[in-house]
């Protein structure tokens, strides 16, 4: 198995190689002796070139920004330029040379901007019908991209498969010959993050409508952001897709529905990519289409999560004190008014009772309602399980247990609720829980 990897914007081949270690381990186990090739995009970036659209949180958190231009970053083409953007056609020529010198390759795995190059390359390898489409479209649309000369005499078979993470595509009319009439029929598996703040929703819809992968395309939504999802089940899904795509039978690929969430396609063959000038996503366009946390809120939430990570090593002990339990909702308080407020806030999950011998209320967790999933219930812990003098003591720690960033994500997707990190009172182990309204 020989696989070509295309990195994302402002990455490099070696960086992408480090980010795919676990994925490649799974592929190697399934296909011993597999080889992987990690080219670097031709456009050299200074980090200062990208500060205009990086969020404030990225600048705040990274020490590299103290001397940003010492970092080597590359891209396959420039963002926010006229169609075709500078570097894109050059990158396709570089890909063709790699196919000649290092090929043949069985498939391609791409992240973000690399998915534009990877899907276009797969399209150009699909035979004379694709070249004919370029000629026909150029006759009717003078500004269209022409069939690259570097692919006219290339001796490389069509790719057997393609894998993309956080994909987008060229949606300008100048690129139509790559995607339509015929569709790209190379089997593609697309991973999309449910909380991806980089690729806007209209770009995800464009990838759907372009039907990249034809009848054998597949899309997996993962509960993450603009990144390669972590977890063996996702890497095994890639292996299963490769195995399915490399078989001669054009059967549809299926993932275990109990482990990996799927999104079925309901589009029709006649649907084509959006006819808009948008080619590349940005944080600014994402903000215009999707409500995301403000920079200040994001920075605050990230600092709290950083605090929490530091507090875990070495981990302080949490001592169970009694069977009395109170709601732990982000602030330390054992007053009856605070408990009444918390109980009211979570009335569908908790009930409050008052014991005659105590001045404080006891709040007990009850079973979730029928419409709620049990694993989404908020954990309840004792307020006094925090050992005095430990790193966990004080309102600062209790406030950071409540991740503002995750709550913003929940609200953004129409699922208002609260996300908690809470101690379970057993050896200091921290667990998480979620409550949806």
From Swiss-Prot:
Q: Which residues are catalytic?
A: 112 (charge relay system), 196 (charge relay system), 226 (charge relay system)
Pathway the protein contributes to: Secondary metabolite biosynthesis
Classification via InterPro entries? AB_hydrolase_fold, FSH-like_dom, LovG
Report the EC code(s) recorded for this entry. Answer: 3.1.2.-
Give disulfide pairs as residue numbers: none
Task: Quote the Pfam families the UniProt record gives.
Answer: FSH1
GO MF annotations in UniProt:
hydrolase activity
Q: Does the keyword Kinase apply?
A: no
Which terms are listed as keywords in the entry? Hydrolase
Q: Where is the composition biased (Low complexity)?
A: 314-345
Q: Which GO terms are recorded in the biological process aspect for this UniProt protein?
A: secondary metabolic process
Task: Name the phenotypic consequences of knocking out this gene.
Answer: Greatly diminishes the production of fellutamides.
Query: GO cellular component annotations, sorted alphabetically?
Result: cytoplasm; nucleus
> Which stretches does the entry tag as region Disordered?
306-362
Whether Transferase counts among this entry's keywords is no
Role this protein plays: Esterase; part of the inp gene cluster that mediates the biosynthesis of fellutamide B, a mycotoxin that acts as a proteasome inhibitor. In the first step of fellutabmide B biosynthesis inpC activates 3-hydroxydodecanoic acid to generate 3-hydroxydodecanoyl-AMP that is then loaded onto the T0 domain of inpB. The 3-hydroxydodecanoyl-S-phosphopantetheinyl-T0 is sequentially extended with L-Asn and L-Gln by the two CAT modules of inpB. The linear lipodipeptide from inpB is then transferred onto inpA for the addition of the third amino acid, L-Leu.
| Membership in a protein family | Belongs to the LovG family.
Protein's recorded name:
Esterase inpF
Q: Which organism is it from?
A: Emericella nidulans (strain FGSC A4 / ATCC 38163 / CBS 112.46 / NRRL 194 / M139) (Aspergillus nidulans)
